[in-house]
């Protein structure tokens, strides 16, 4: 057990030393933030919704990233590397690529669309892509679930209190 403990302590010391060596003088670190498809897709969707000027170079990078992480196995986008198909992530990535300018009949887009349709269509996605699609007029607002405003008046012990949602 002592040998394992020494090995663990040495690994922790090496890891901490490597992190401290990478730390900037003002105390922060700069590392690549790897995310699933939803973060860059939502960024594109938000920029377009806000009417921000198109940054073609940035959009090209994001489009390449989204195309690169599309699953060859299920043709959609997972929530983590090599993960299972996630319909909501796939809807967002597909729509972001479409917004960037990828043709809907491009092979990667056709495969993604077929995967979404096979999983029940856009209506099978969670509330977030439904809201985004409704914002762009690509989906009905009636598909977005509503919360009755009276729930705000419910006491904390109530089973469906806002603090529990």
Q: Which ranges hold each PLM region?
A:
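Preference for long, amphipathic alpha-helical scaffolds in soluble/luminal domains
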Residues: 1-165
